[in-house]
Amino acid sequence: MANMAVSRIKREFKEVMRSEEIVQCSIKIELVNDSWTELRGEIAGPPDTPYEGGKFVLEIKVPETYPFNPPKVRFITRIWHPNISSVTGAICLDILKDNWAAAMTLRTVLLSLQALLAAAEPDDPQDAVVAYQFKDKYDLFLLTAKHWTNAYAGGPHTFPDCDSKIQRLRDMGIDEHEARAVLSKENWNLEKATEGLFS
C-alpha cells in the first residue's frame, strides 16, 4: 500500500479511537491486518429506530489510492434496510461513491453509516424488495427490521410469530437464514414463502 495512504489511515484510525463523539455514538474500529488495508468497524443501531439495541459489524477495505478514492465498506452483520443489500451487505451511500472527497475521513464514513440507519433513502435503494416494503408496508418493514436486528445484531426484541414461521420452514428442511429471507420478502406470508421455495 502506498505510504501516503498508510500514514493517512493510521492518523485517522487514531482520531477515531480518541474521538469522544465516536465513543458516545457507540462506534468502534479495529485493525484486521498489519498492512492497514482492512479494518473492522462496529456501529450501534441508533435510538428510536428498528436497529436500536443492535451492534452492526462493517468490513472496511482501504484502497491504495486512499484518500483520493473512498474505502470499500459493507455490512458483515445482516440487516433489513432499503439502502443496504440484505444478501451481500453492499451499501448505497453517496459518500462511498461519487460524492467522496479526499478531505473525508473514516470518522465521516462511520458517522454517516450510523446516520443512514436512522434516515433511510427508499427512493435510492440498494435492496428494491426492502425499499418497496418500506414505502408500501411500513409496519411490516419495522417488524422485519426489528426481527433481523434481534436475529443478527443481538437486538432486544422477540417475535414469536416470526420465529414460529421460520421454524415451520426449517421443519421442511430450509436453512434458517433462507427461511428468514424468504418470509421477509413475502411479508411474513407463510403460504407464499412456501410456494416460492417449493414451486
Curated annotation (Swiss-Prot):
Enzyme class: transferase
A GO CC term attached to the entry: nucleus
Tissue-level expression: During gastrulation, expression is highest in the invaginating posterior midgut primordium (PMG), high expression is also observed in the cephalic furrow and ventral ectodermal neurogenic region. In stage 10-11 embryos, expression is high in the pole cells present in the pocket formed by the PMG. During germ band retraction, expression appears to reinitiate in many tissues, especially the gut and nervous system. After dorsal closure, expression is detectable at low levels throughout the embryo.
Transmembrane segments annotated in the record for this chain: none
EC numbers, comma separated: 2.3.2.23
GO process terms (BP): positive regulation of peptidoglycan recognition protein signaling pathway; protein polyubiquitination
Source species, domain of life: Eukaryota
Keywords per UniProt: ATP-binding, Nucleotide-binding, Transferase, Ubl conjugation pathway
Annotated active site: 92
Pathway note: Protein modification; protein ubiquitination
SUPFAM superfamilies, per the entry: UBA-like (SSF46934), UBC-like (SSF54495)
GO molecular function: ATP binding; proteasome binding; ubiquitin conjugating enzyme activity; ubiquitin protein ligase binding; ubiquitin-protein transferase activity
Pfam families the UniProt entry points to: UQ_con (PF00179)
Catalyzed reactions: S-ubiquitinyl-[E1 ubiquitin-activating enzyme]-L-cysteine + [E2 ubiquitin-conjugating enzyme]-L-cysteine = [E1 ubiquitin-activating enzyme]-L-cysteine + S-ubiquitinyl-[E2 ubiquitin-conjugating enzyme]-L-cysteine
Domain UBC core span(s) in chain numbering: 4-154
Record domain UBA: where: 161-199
InterPro entries: UBA, UBA-like_sf, UBCD4_UBA, UBQ-conjugat_E2_core, UBQ-conjugating_AS, UBQ-conjugating_enzyme/RWD
Similarity section: Belongs to the ubiquitin-conjugating enzyme family.
Function: Catalyzes the covalent attachment of ubiquitin to other proteins.
Subunit-level organization: Interacts with Rpn10.
Descriptive protein name: Ubiquitin-conjugating enzyme E2-22 kDa
Gene encoding the protein: Ubc4
